């Protein structure tokens, strides 16, 4: 199931942005603001009450009963249409207003949406008496919160996301408390034991085989009019495949199975392309929701940039989402044909300057319209996915760590040198390396970057981000009670199950 989408709507100054920041800050999410495209609308990832979801701040709506639809910006309407859940915020202190009534009248027409009235700013007042008049809106119970203090926010999200629990992958992963699983983990595994670390390597090998057996999912993302539709159609046209459109809800992307050179792929279409070989030159409808969900669901992301335009903050925001999601990356510079050589040189110089922090990604200069360079993309796609899922062992990672520290020792802290003991794999896609040692909390960021670059060079990882986790002592999960993500919980359960079986 696609990640649930929660839209925050309401008139100005009712606390939507405060609630948005409260929700997204729970995961230190990268929040993108797309000026011009979405005006003052903000989109972010959030994790609260055990759920992952996307939250939209739709901005203030100054509507009236007669003209609310005219007053709502097009992007606000789109956000409501794309949302699974609409949280309609009202100000408990200010009371019911004509704008609230107008917005409620519009929302009542959206019968297919879960709509919840949320009375904010209930701190320091008799909330029940102040909220009573909001029942006139005819949208059911009134939920009370104080977003600035966080009061009632977790309970609110638990309630509104509950209908999705059975459909979400991690719904049954949190039945046992983190403390119970932490205790079992610490009892079962000794990370100073070669036998146990070898068993973990074997367990991760099983996970790696599962990853490698999958179709490679490719998402083509980028700003409007950079040529996503043209590139999608060119790829499908070149491969002469039958396109199976499998639309879900109005906000779901289209998943198109295809094959090339014996490798199965799934192309995630966020541009709304439906027919192979038919390129529409009209302005593409840009959906941030489709883009974020496609990035999360993909293995490899093709970030498409228009060679005739400068790299924008929107490009960098999309790039931030890709890196934050840990996805493999290929940079595609489209509309390369017909440019003068001096313009090409200037574009390459600009790419080197603005994108120097992702020098691990391959860059392709193509013309989606004419097809030049498109076929070569698949070499980089396969390379990036292979690097993201390559086999790593504890012995190999520890050996590389030793070489790195021999060449450049960690710094002295308080007269004691930071000691890095060993490393082991923590997962794949993206590659995760867990480094154990003493005084890890004092290890400078510059040295962490050095180790990351050293591992990348030694393992020859191209096109994929690499993540290093630094753990004090021998237990990789020490001090992380209640902080594991659902994916980490699932991974740890698989490891425990595998090693218990192997020890019998």
Curated annotation (Swiss-Prot):
Name the Gene Ontology biological process terms.
Answer: ribosome biogenesis
Keywords on record: GTP-binding, Nucleotide-binding, Repeat, Ribosome biogenesis
Chain residues that bind GTP 2 = 222-229, 269-273, 334-337
Would the keyword DNA-binding be found if you checked this record's keyword annotation? no
Composition bias, kind Acidic residues: at what positions? 180-191
Q: Which residues form the KH-like domain?
A: 390-474
User: Which Gene Ontology molecular-function terms are recorded?
Assistant: ATP hydrolysis activity; GTP binding; ribosome binding
Q: Give the compositionally biased regions (Basic and acidic residues).
A: 168-179
Query: Where is GTP 1 annotated to bind?
Result: 10-17, 57-61, 120-123
| Classification via Pfam families | KH_dom-like, MMR_HSR1
| Subunit structure, interactors included | Associates with the 50S ribosomal subunit.
Q: Which family does it belong to?
A: Belongs to the TRAFAC class TrmE-Era-EngA-EngB-Septin-like GTPase superfamily. EngA (Der) GTPase family.
- Give the protein's biological function: GTPase that plays an essential role in the late steps of ribosome biogenesis.
Q: What protein is this chain from? A: GTPase Der
């Amino acid at each position: 199931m696609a990640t649930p989408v929660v839209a925050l709507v309401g008139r100005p100054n009712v606390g939507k942005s405060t609630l948005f920041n409260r929700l997204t800050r729970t995961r230190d999410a990268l929040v993108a603001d797309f000026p011009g495209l979405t005006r003052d609308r903000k989109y972010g990832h959030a994790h609260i009450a055990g759920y992952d979801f996307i939250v939209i701040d739709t901005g203030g709506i100054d509507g009236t009963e007669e003209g609310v639809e005219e007053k709502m910006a097009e992007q606000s309407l789109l956000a409501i249409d794309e949302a699974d859940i609409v949280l309609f915020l009202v100000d408990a202190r200010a009371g019911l207003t004509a704008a609230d009534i107008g917005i409620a009248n519009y929302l009542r027409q959206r019968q297919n949406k879960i709509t919840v009235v949320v009375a904010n700013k209930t701190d320091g007042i008799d909330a029940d008496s102040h909220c009573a008049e909001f029942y006139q809106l005819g949208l059911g119970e009134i939920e009370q919160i104080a977003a600035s203090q966080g009061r009632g926010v977790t309970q609110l999200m638990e309630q509104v996301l509950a209908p999705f629990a059975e459909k979400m992958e991690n719904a049954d992963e949190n039945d046992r408390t983190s403390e119970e699983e932490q205790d079992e983990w610490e009892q079962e595994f000794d990370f100073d034991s070669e036998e146990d670390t070898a068993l973990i390597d074997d367990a991760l090998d099983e996970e790696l085989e599962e990853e490698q057996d999958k179709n490679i999912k490719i998402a083509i993302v980028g700003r409007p009019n950079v040529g996503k539709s043209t590139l999608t159609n060119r790829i499908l046209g070149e491969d002469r495949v039958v396109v199976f459109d499998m639309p879900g809800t109005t906000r779901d992307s289209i998943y198109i199975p295809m094959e090339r050179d014996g490798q199965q792929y799934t192309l995630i279409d966020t541009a709304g392309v439906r027919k192979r070989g038919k390129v529409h030159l009209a302005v593409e409808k840009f959906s941030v929701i489709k883009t974020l969900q496609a990035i999360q669901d993909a293995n490899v992301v093709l970030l498409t940039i228009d060679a005739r335009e400068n790299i924008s903050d929107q490009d960098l925001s999309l790039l931030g989402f890709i890196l934050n999601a840990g996805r493999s990356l290929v940079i595609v510079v489209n509309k390369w044909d017909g440019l003068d050589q001096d313009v090409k040189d200037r574009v390459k110089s600009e790419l080197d300057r603005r994108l120097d922090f992702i020098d691990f990604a391959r860059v392709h200069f193509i013309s989606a319209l004419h097809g030049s360079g498109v076929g070569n993309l698949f070499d980089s796609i396969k390379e990036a996915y292979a690097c993201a899922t390559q086999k790593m062992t504890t012995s190999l990672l520890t050996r590389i760590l030793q070489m790195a520290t021999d060449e450049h020792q960690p710094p002295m802290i308080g007269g004691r040198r930071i000691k890095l003991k060993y490393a082991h794999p923590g997962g794949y896609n993206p590659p995760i390396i867990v480094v154990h040692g003493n005084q890890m909390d004092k290890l400078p960021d510059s040295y962490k970057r050095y180790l990351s670059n050293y591992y990348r060079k030694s393992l020859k990882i191209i096109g994929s981000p690499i993540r290093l986790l630094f753990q004090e002592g021998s237990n990789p999960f020490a001090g992380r009670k209640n902080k594991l993500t659902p994916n980490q919980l699932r991974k740890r359960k698989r490891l425990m199950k595998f090693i218990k079986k192997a020890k019998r």
